[in-house]
């Protein structure tokens, strides 16, 4: 697909009517068609990317940079106006589909041409606004059809590290995400018994990967070996697989959203564990755990060598984590309820503001816990505190929300014990604000204390807020009708009532 001229575009100027853009494209196609091939080809800065608009069944319409820019502008305006498609299609894929829809519209535009009156030549007929408006309608209909055909329903599978196999933790769900041990996932989703048998042979070391690779290249019988190879290369060394059904999404967008939602589900699980253990929950695509060699030489020439290895997944006394996970299912069900509302809302637009903020805050907490730098962890914890409380940067509102959720009623806090308001102050005002605004040094500073306070504050807030928000989503019928401020007042009232009844 040819690129637009960014510096020649109008940027944030008022949108050009779609009919005018279509007229520009049609006129430019006519202009380019009249050029000698060599002259048209020379217009492209990259000979491998010609200035052209492609058609579904092959072929293309030559254009100049003017036509390319008009097609890009029409595509961008369509992208901005179609929020539902923005949720289900990757932007780059959308642009390609839009160019294809323009090409198909040009190919079939003859049916839209006005009749030529008797005694007149075709060249004398003026194509008016009605003609271009009809082409825009055709383009939009074709775009929707192409988008639908490119957006199948699939189950997305993302390998994870959670619990060691000796813990015997059974499969479980966090809302729309199912977590299955590797063996159970293979039995559930690899439908071909011969493919499963090949995988089992490799895992039992009865067959090595080199032999399986060789079998996959055999013309007639290699298909099943090739499928087994695909599965094994995807699963690699992971012991769990997260599965989520993605309905009506283009493939790139489908994978991206699935990865985000699975990541949130893993972060929700991590809230029930200490930060050192939660960091070891990971999924394919996350690179925060690593092994490194450390090498130095002294001034007199001696070699100093060390290494560091961070292992994924957690274990313990055999079976202990199975019991713990059974005890945490109530919280995970509440988190799953919110996550399901997030996924549902994001199919065609936005989720409820309370749900969006909860999801964003959970992501920030997960990033803070994985972060190697105290500096960035404190910033992330501060962002999470702001987002979860709906304070919009107002520290007093943040403190009020946190105290409503966590401050004991009528109890005197012993001297020297960290209070909720001090925790918010240290994480947000003294931490996130000063770091983000450059008021204090960050990267190589010792920020272990504010990081530890953030680690204490945010999981405690999620522990209280998550079940209350889930209950509101399930039982408060008017929640969707409330604006954000009223919804937060209702949430705070429910948090206060919960604390009073505890």
Language-model-detected regions and their locations in the chain:
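Polyanionic, low-complexity intrinsically disordered segments
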Residues: 2-155, 413-431, 438-502
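Juxtamembrane/membrane-water interface recognition
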Residues: 25, 44-46, 55-58, 178, ...
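Charged, non-catalytic interaction/linker regions at domain boundaries
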Residues: 104-376, 383, 456-502
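Active-site-adjacent bridging/hinge elements
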Residues: 352-361, 402, 429-439
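Flexible secondary-structure boundary motifs
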Residues: 380-418
């Amino acid at each position: 697909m040819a690129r637009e001229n960014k510096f020649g575009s109008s940027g944030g100027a008022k949108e050009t009517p779609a009919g005018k853009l279509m007229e520009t494209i049609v006129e430019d196609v006519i202009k380019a068609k009249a050029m000698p091939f060599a002259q048209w080809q020379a217009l492209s800065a990259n000979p491998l990317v010609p200035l052209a608009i492609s058609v579904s069944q092959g072929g293309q319409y030559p254009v100049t940079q003017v036509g390319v820019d008009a097609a890009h502008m029409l595509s961008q305006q369509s992208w901005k106006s179609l929020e539902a498609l923005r949720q289900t299609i990757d932007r780059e894929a959308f642009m390609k589909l839009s160019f294809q829809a323009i090409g198909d519209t040009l190919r079939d535009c003859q049916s839209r041409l006005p009749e030529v009156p008797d005694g007149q030549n075709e060249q004398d007929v003026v194509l008016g606004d009605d003609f271009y408006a009809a082409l825009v309608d055709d383009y939009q209909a074709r775009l929707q059809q192409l988008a639908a055909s490119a957006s199948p329903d699939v189950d997305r599978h993302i390998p994870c590290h959670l619990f060691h196999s000796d813990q015997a933790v059974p499969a479980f769900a966090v809302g729309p995400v199912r977590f299955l041990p590797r063996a159970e996932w293979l039995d559930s989703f690899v439908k071909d018994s011969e493919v499963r048998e090949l995988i089992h042979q490799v895992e039992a070391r009865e067959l090595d990967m080199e032999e399986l690779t060789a079998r996959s290249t055999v013309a007639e019988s290699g298909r099943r070996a090739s499928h087994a190879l695909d599965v094994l290369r995807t699963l690699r060394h992971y012991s769990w697989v997260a599965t989520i059904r993605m309905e009506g999404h283009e493939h790139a967008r489908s994978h991206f959203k699935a990865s985000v939602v699975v990541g949130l589900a893993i972060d929700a699980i991590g809230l029930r564990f200490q930060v050192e253990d939660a960091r070891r929950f990971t999924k394919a695509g996350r690179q925060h755990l690593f092994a490194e060699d450390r090498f130095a030489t002294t001034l007199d020439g001696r070699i100093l060598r060390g290494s560091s290895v961070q292992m994924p997944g957690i274990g313990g006394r055999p079976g202990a984590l199975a019991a713990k996970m059974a005890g945490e299912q109530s919280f995970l069900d509440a988190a799953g309820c919110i996550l399901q509302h997030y996924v549902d809302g994001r199919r065609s637009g936005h989720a409820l503001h309370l749900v969006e903020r909860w999801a964003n805050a959970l992501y920030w907490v997960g990033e803070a816990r994985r972060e190697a730098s105290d500096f960035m962890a404190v910033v992330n914890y501060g962002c999470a505190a702001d987002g979860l409380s709906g304070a919009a940067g107002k520290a007093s509102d943040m403190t009020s929300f946190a105290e409503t959720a966590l401050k004991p009623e009528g109890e005197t806090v012993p001297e020297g014990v960290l209070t909720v308001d001090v925790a918010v102050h240290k994480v947000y005002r003294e931490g996130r604000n000063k770091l983000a605004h450059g008021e204090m040094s960050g990267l190589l500073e010792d920020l272990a204390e504010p990081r530890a306070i953030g680690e204490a504050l945010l999981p405690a807030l999620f522990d209280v807020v998550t079940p209350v928000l889930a209950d509101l989503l399930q039982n408060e019928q008017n929640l969707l009708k409330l604006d954000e401020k009223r919804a937060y007042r209702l949430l705070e009232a429910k948090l206060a009532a919960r604390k009073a009844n505890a």
